[in-house]
Amino acid sequence: IIIQAGGKGTRLEGLTRNKPKCLVPVNNLPIIFYAFQKFKDANFTIIADYKTDVLEKYLRAFGSQYKFNIIKASKKGTISGIKEAISTYKDDEPFMIMWCDLILSEDFEIPQNSGNYIGISKDFECRWSYVDGKFIKTPSKENGVAGLFIFENKQALKNIDEEGALAIEM
């Protein structure tokens, strides 16, 4: 599981002054730990950029029971770190990408059917939408991109850019 945790969390203002957004607590638990607990046995690749040193120290101290490695993207934008993370996967290996601030419901399950999936929001507004097989930077409550992507292999992302925002067609 790849967790995109590189943003500054600017909309959280003072909460991220001394820590990355993924360590902001929700009900006394850092957001990233919801993913750790949901997928206890998974191997996590965490893409970090802001306050990486704080994240590393915190996870080594309080997350040692989970299997993770932290990478810092060498180029700009969301896609740079994702591209670097998937380069370590086998060509036919399925994987999931999720944003660090996504807390999945207890009954969420990964689909068992093969294929690629995009998490779509039906009840809260997202900054990006998924319309006609494309990402568009238009807020939506009905077709908002919720920050969860499941791929059966690396093929769907083979032509992505080296830097910038995640923009794939499915």
PLM regions with names:
Residues G7, Y50, K154-Q155:
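Alpha-helix/helix-capping structural signal
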Residues I103-G164:
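Conserved core of the sugar-phosphate nucleotidyltransferase
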Residues I3, R11, P25, L29-W99, ...:
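Conserved N-terminal catalytic core of the sugar/cofactor nucleotidyltransferase
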Residues I1-R17:
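N-terminal nucleotide-binding beta1-loop-alpha1 segment
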Residues G14-L15, I86-S87, I110, S140-K141:
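Short secondary-structure boundary/capping segments
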Residues G164-M170:
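A short, conserved alpha-helix in the catalytic core of glycosyltransferases
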Residues Y58, N159, E169:
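Residues that form generic nucleotide/phosphate-binding pockets
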